[in-house]
């Protein structure tokens, strides 16, 4: 059933002159989202990737920076001090970067000085122990999505792009769905409905009964 809706959302949505994302809207029910412990806040690695380039920034010592060949941006501890004095520039960077990674010894300083900017955006850095190679973590982040409900019963999660194959989108959908269901007290019973759409297209309801067997 899910495969049918993925195919339909492509066929029924007019192609645009830019790379459209495909996202799902998840509507919860019977969940007390006023309790932060009940909220969905997941970072999920998509098995088929995002279908587009994501930007990852690394804040670390020079030693770690040299190992992270796949980081899109690299910053030093001194750069953190500069950002403290120029928060406007850092806000622009935070909006442009999808994920931050930081050497664990810098996390306290980053949280204290830049947490007010990164926290609300859900972009608190992922810590890496000193001396460790962050390459694999960065690679996974480039294939990851965030699923965050906050205190709202409806939230949205991208599962790829229109140019991806139906099979790749299906695999990504199943991964996101199963992770979210695993975090709900009643599992599928806490899902009211799920819709899928392209960036500019109309939403189509997804039937997930075959995933709950």
UniProtKB/Swiss-Prot annotation:
Tell me which PROSITE patterns the record gives.
RIBOSOMAL_L1
Recorded GO cellular component terms are: large ribosomal subunit
- Classification via SUPFAM superfamilies: Ribosomal protein L1
Tell me, what is one Gene Ontology molecular-function annotation carried by this entry? rRNA binding
What's any GO biological process attached to this entry?
Answer: translation
What are the UniProt keywords, alphabetically?
Repressor, Ribonucleoprotein, Ribosomal protein, RNA-binding, rRNA-binding, Translation regulation, tRNA-binding
Which cysteines bridge via disulfide bonds?
Answer: none
Residues crossing the lipid bilayer are: none
Q: Does the keyword Repressor apply?
A: yes
Listed InterPro entries: Ribosomal_uL1, Ribosomal_uL1-like, Ribosomal_uL1/biogenesis, Ribosomal_uL1_3-a/b-sand, Ribosomal_uL1_arc, Ribosomal_uL1_CS
- Give the family from UniProt: Belongs to the universal ribosomal protein uL1 family.
Stated role: Binds directly to 23S rRNA. Probably involved in E site tRNA release.
Q: What is this protein called?
A: Large ribosomal subunit protein uL1
The species is Picrophilus torridus (strain ATCC 700027 / DSM 9790 / JCM 10055 / NBRC 100828 / KAW 2/3)
